[in-house]
Amino acid sequence: MKVASLLSLALPGAALAATDPFQSRCNEFQNKIDIANVTVRSVAYVAAGQNISQAEVASVCKASVQASVDLCRVTMNISTSDRSHLWAEAWLPRNYTGRFVSTGNGGLAGCVQETDLNFAANFGFATVGTNGGHDGDTAKYFLNNSEVLADFAYRSVHEGTVVGKQLTQLFYDEGYNYSYYLGCSTGGRQGYQQVQRFPDDYDGVIAGSAAMNFINLISWGAFLWKATGLADDPDFISANLWSVIHQEIVRQCDLVDGALDGIIEDPDFCAPVIERLICDGTTNGTSCITGAQAAKVNRALSDFYGPDGTVYYPRLNYGGEADSASLYFTGSMYSRTEEWYKYVVYNDTNWNSSQWTLESAKLALEQNPFNIQAFDPNITAFRDRGGKLLSYHGTQDPIISSTDSKLYYRRVANALNAAPSELDEFYRFFQISGMGHCGDGTGASYIGQGYGTYTSKAPQVNLLRTMVDWVENGKAPEYMPGNKLNANGSIEYMRKHCRYPKHNIHTGPGNYTDPNSWTCV
């Protein structure tokens, strides 16, 4: 008795595990895992509020994450060839609801999106994520290694999903009833890849701000650099001037939707005249631009054409130009663009941005390694198996043009010969006015797409819940509710974002903060 008492004092965690079936199951789980091509690195019980250990995470991916719920965390390597592997994590929550979800990546991948894992686990999803096959937001690992490139192009999410589902079935006696996907940016592209190439992987796919026209998006970065020039050019446009240009564009376009709220609801209905900003001799160069600079702005805000005259990529969103300045208008080629051409297109570390031409863009598109372009409109297999695709894109996105998401929607409509009402049965796309890249922005951009965009003050604004309602209950979203939050986290106002091809018009009688004063037309 005395010995037992001493042991209970010395080993409180062990005693707790002995009385906690969930923790015991987690502690014993590693012995049950025997999956082909999987090497388990760790299995650990993590209590709600506990910091997630970053000991085995690549240094460039380390982030501060606290578990939202009690969970069992599995870290592992998944071999995809004799020259490539994925770092992956599975988070298996105590409050499991019988649902599985896979998460995607961002940028040039390289990191497990642990915030997305945490978000999904919070709502009872068994969740998995990979690093896309390499460490960090860089293309250098693609040099002379096509297998690593294949992981990034299409393989990582699918392989992670296969393993994640197996782990879910091993850990929970009931297995899983439904499977989902959640991703944005590169994660959006990966979501579309899954729909197009692996239609049976998920019952519901959430794909936001998708980089699906990936190759041409990469080349667009070079086009924008060429359009705006080097930093030492006499007509170079500084970040401060881009802010002035942005303010003028918003001034000209804000009221097109009927409300003076500082937000351009749909950039397609905006046609700003940049020449209004040309200095007239009585203004200084800090609040106006030269004619040569106006010409540069017009080039930068125009469609990007390939050498054969076809549109490779649509123009930048009006309203996003100020935030684009720090990425595309710096006087240097966008880093991800330069890396892609150096390590993939030319596979030559000596290649530099000065060598880029329109023929380079043509070559990149012709290569399309492992069909990384997720632009195939034939998604009939996903439709026919009952899958649901929910897509969103911020109209203020400074990195990926939201027009590209519209173009893909139209491509699907044409390929399937389907009217919007028919596409609505399985594919719904929402433009989110005032949203930047995957979030933030000046509008009601908090739609519950992940941590930092969900608030318990409005629990109904939750993309995962919306998708579950559609897949499991047949309740398709007619609009996408979004919140504009104040600095203290309180809700300033809510807006009902329209389902494409409709767009929002302010019709009153309330002001722009009243969600019922807007009409989708």
Curated annotation (Swiss-Prot):
Post-translational modification: Glycosylated.
Active-site residue numbers: S185, D397, H437
Induction: By caffeic acid, p-coumaric acid and to a lesser extent by ferulic acid. Repressed by simple sugars, probably via the carbon catabolite repressor protein CreA.
InterPro entries the UniProt entry points to: AB_hydrolase_fold (IPR029058), Tannase/feruloyl_esterase (IPR011118)
Keywords of this entry: Calcium, Carbohydrate metabolism, Disulfide bond, Glycoprotein, Hydrolase, Metal-binding, Polysaccharide degradation, Secreted, Serine esterase, Signal, Xylan degradation
Signal peptide range in chain numbering: 1-17
GO cellular component term of the entry, any: extracellular region
Keyword Signal included in the entry's annotation: yes
Catalytic activity: feruloyl-polysaccharide + H2O = ferulate + polysaccharide
Origin superkingdom: Eukaryota
Molecular-function GO term, any one: metal ion binding
Pfam families assigned: Tannase (PF07519)
Coiled coil region boundaries: none
Positions contributing to Ca(2+) binding: D254, D257, A259, D261, I263
GO terms under biological process: cell wall macromolecule catabolic process; pectin catabolic process; xylan catabolic process
Stated regulation of activity: Inhibited by the specific serine esterase inhibitor AEBSF.
Cellular localization per UniProt: Secreted
Subunit structure: Homodimer.
Role, per record: Involved in degradation of plant cell walls. Hydrolyzes of the feruloyl-arabinose ester bond in arabinoxylans as well as the feruloyl-galactose and feruloyl-arabinose ester bonds in pectin.
Family under the similarity heading: Belongs to the tannase family.
PANTHER family from the UniProt entry: FERULOYL ESTERASE B-RELATED
Record's protein name: Feruloyl esterase B
